Each structure stands twice: as C-alpha cells, then as structure tokens.
Amino acid sequence: MLEKIQETAAFLKGKMHTSPETAIILGTGLGSLANEITEKYEIKYEDIPNFPVSTVEGHSGKLIFGKLGNKEIMAMQGRFHYYEGYSMKEVTFPVRVMRELGIKTLFVSNASGGTNPEFEIGDLMIITDHINYFPEHPLRGKNIPYGPRFPDMSEAYDKELIRKADAIAAEKGIKVQHGIYIGTQGPTFETPAEYKLFHILGADAVGMSTVPEVIVANHCGIKVFGISVVTDLGVEGKIVEVSHEEVQKAADAAQPKMTTIMRELINRIDTSLS
C-alpha cells in the first residue's frame, strides 16, 4: 500500500509545477468550483497509476492544479464512493497521496439529506463533527506510518477554520448552519425510519461520503474543513421521493454560496495553520 502511494505521488510530482499545501474534494453538483481555478493544469484519474476511476454522474474524474485566488491548490473533481464497490483503502487512497505531496489542509464538500427539522433545502451546513456509520473502517489493517495506530478524533474538523468560515459567512450575508454529518454506505437514499434513527443518534445531515476521507486526513495530520449542502429533507412530514438528478439540481443552486465561502476561507489560511 505504502509503495503504491509513493509511486502515485512520484508520478504526480513529475507532472506538477506548483507546490500546493491546500486540497479540495469537490462533491455532488459542486464541481463547478473548478471554474474558479486559474493557471490550471489537469490530470485525468485514468492516467494516474493506482488511482480508482469515478463512476458517478456529476463526478468528472480528474485532479486539477492551479490557483484559487492567490493560493496554490489541488482539487479532486470527482470522488470515490464505497457504494461503487471500492474498498475503503481505495476510497481514501487520494488523501494519502495528498499527504505524500505535502498537503496540510483539506477542504471537503458534499450533498446531504437534512435530518434536523430546522434545516431547509439549499442550506449550507458547516460540519462540526461526524458519525461513522460505514461497515468498514478506512484504517483497518496494518497501520500506515503517516500517523498513530489509534488516532485522536476529538477535533476532526478544525475549529479555527470553522470560526473563520462563520466570520466570512456573516461578512457576506450567507446563512450557514452547523451540524453533525453521518456517513452511510449507500447507494440507497434513506428510508423515513432511517432518517428518524440518524436524527435520534445526533446527526443533522446524512450522506454517502466524506467521513472516510476525513478519518484518513486526521490520521495523516491534515487539518480538515467540511461543508455540506442540504439537498433533500429527511424530516417527518417533509420527506418526498428523491432522485440523484434532484440532488444535483439543489446542490447546483447552492453552489455560488459554497464557492464564496470556500474561496475566501482558502485565501485566509494562516501560514501557521497550513
């Protein structure tokens, strides 16, 4: 595993002419943040040794390097999901490669179903914590020496980044929620009973990604900021039939607000933080 990570990182280093310390994983319907990246160059997943290839509509499958504002970044346009049949090690492989490339801060985004009755479709939820509901753990097996065998998860999402995001949202007049994200394996959307269960467990939103990448990022010593777009509601009396197309449509509608927060936050990262 470590050899594959290093082989992939060496391949990318040979193609890179920037040295980003910031990475972004762009989720469902949020890939258009890539349009904000300037001076960019791209590498398709299919051309990268050992990389899985995304199979989900709306995830185009490439690494993008360049600048967002004045900050050098790398972005994953298209992520890998457990429900696609990948192992957790494959799902999180890119995060370990990021660590090998010198990434210090990771920004993750996703679409989710809201279980908090105060949420509305289109809300942005800053992720303050998560619940891992996946059946396989990404750190299962021999420990890769990027971090300890038993990593601490008491601050999986960096509090200073959350504080700065709140300040940016207030400054720009963007409404944001705070909440706990629960990650499930999918690919089915939740039943009303499952939504109710997840709310009882303490989750404010549910989705099929993010948690594995965040666990591995924490193991690698990478700071994380996560934001979720509430694209449907799992609240009693508000549950309607949902499709992937509707999820993408709701995510696309919220995208300008998310882009503003991400762009501003990435450009306000302190050197000491990154």
Placement of each model-derived feature along the sequence:
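Generic non-transmembrane alpha-helical segments
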Residues: F11, K15, E160, K164-I174, ...
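His/Asp/Glu-rich mid-to-C-terminal helical/loop segments that flank catalytic regions of hydrolases
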Residues: V235-S274
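Metabolite-binding pocket within alpha/beta catalytic cores that recognizes anionic/polar moieties
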Residues: M1-M153
